[in-house]
């Protein structure tokens, strides 16, 4: 594993608007980067040599509520795509998720479309969106998000898709949507290249009660979503305790939501954080690889260690078809950012068993004051290097609070 670039984002890049629940996202073009996190956005036209800070609270109007948290960025063709989540204007009202696009990524260059729950169903006027993600197919940009009621209880998950061709045009952006009340926190698969995940968007969710993955497919050419339940090895969704020699805690928010997913050829992969079990003394990453034509599980390359916890995996294929990961490892229980790739993939009969080869990028000097970390990080295929990826994460440097968060952008390759 080769770390080609390791960029630490300073205060000028983030406006010191950082948080320990950092939720970083990154997108890359051939020459530029766009990075977001709680609660900043920043653009580099020269792969990190310089940065322009964009304040998510003021860059776009707060006419339908104040910016809250949760941002996702993607590169779609020649456009930077920036998704921002806003707070409800008043208690008991809708919030919005705002989809913004720009050809330059610079301040004051954006146009946008807003989406509220009641834009999908008129009677959804007292619920709110949370925990979004974006995926890409040949023809669509896909949003997955949860919906909660005024008492913060989960109600449903929603998948929305927009035609990619509409992103380049002014005016209304048509959408289709699908919803389920049986699976939440749906994670879309990542693909590589201009076509993204190809002609079908797959997405997945965990069901610990049946030791299953809920797997869904929405073809570009169809208005309908098909779903399956795929049995995998069991895991624990509660025991995320892991206090090491350095003391402290950073997994108080950990759960078993799928945080990484990919599609390579006919293989689908999903990864999530599991609590510890008898033969694995620390929380670890569960991973299942599925054949999309048979829905058989063909490999379960978990990532675990006898010396510390692994959590918050993000997955993406490279353009060459290798699968990359970014995740956090608790070395002495201090969260460290690590990246790596899956060897022995795709799995072959009689071949090597798929396994993760990981490298540590940066180690924290402290744990967060309140034990809160996560909820996700990001890895993307590098746009011009076929065997490389771009990842975004964060560590704590020199203290325990949000001002000590140091976001990082990493380019790595096999």
Regions found by a protein language model. Name each.
Residues 1-414:
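C-terminal PAP-associated
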